[in-house]
Amino acid sequence: MKGKEPSWRFKKPLILPPMVSKKPLKKPRLYLRRGEKIGKGLKSLATLQIEAALAELHGNNVSPGPVHNARVSIKKTRSIILLASPALGRVRREFLLDLLHEAGSRLAPLRDSEVQVQSLDVVLEAAGLPVEQFASLRDGLADIAKQRRLNDCRQVPRIIAFLEKVHESIPEWPLNSLEPRDLRRRIRRTYRRGRTTIDVCSSGGDEELFHTWRKLAKHLGYQLRLTAKYWPHEAEPLLSEITKISELSGRERDYTLLLQTMNGGPKNRSSEEAIALVTTLIPPLRQQVIELGLRFYDPKPKLFIEPLEL
């Protein structure tokens, strides 16, 4: 955690109700209502997202589903903070983003280790290869995920503490001055950054730059959802495109992480075959995502933001 905790941090503790049901938690709202005051609405949405993340992790839960859902809620909260950035100010914004980064970065290895087992299953099924042939490789990945859960469950109290600090601060966010034009500018800025980055990605094979663009596209998707009620057709055409981009680029990322793990593990005939297979899948998948991205980001920023009724 960088820097000192600001003196304006809200001090009210968060007390979650006891978890009496194991039913899936309801997905919290992620859109501003028409006529709703922007500042008040964003604070309400941030509260819903943080409380959802805390509820998922309640009882030091490190099961795959809750970990994934908590990470998504953290990312959505980050998008809300960036959208509210003009009113929050740099110091407060960076403090909040740092807290979310600390929480999210501790959950990421848990999610990644679980997904690698699933990714291997998907790859083998798509290739029509017998799962039994790769049993030792799959068992090794499953053991990594199991050990990660055992080790990282101790991280959950720290993660919860970071999220509670964000939750405690929300009532103090000075968002009354936030205007519709501020949101337009922030979304336009996010779109412009993504547009510039995808142009560079299309002319080279920089893996990290592609990963950066993937996160920008996902961030734009959340901003579209936040303002969906102010777009024609509630932004459904745009959301459909950006969701497909996010899903395919996320798959590319999962395959890349799987490949890194297999390259660093023990080698045998089966693992070498799996490595070769995944290696051939990544470049065309990445190229497909880039082509979709270039099509989506074709309009200039001014033209893209024009239909937004804010």
Identify the function of each model-found stretch.
Residues 8-310:
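Cationic, histidine-enriched alpha-helical/coil surfaces that engage anionic ligands
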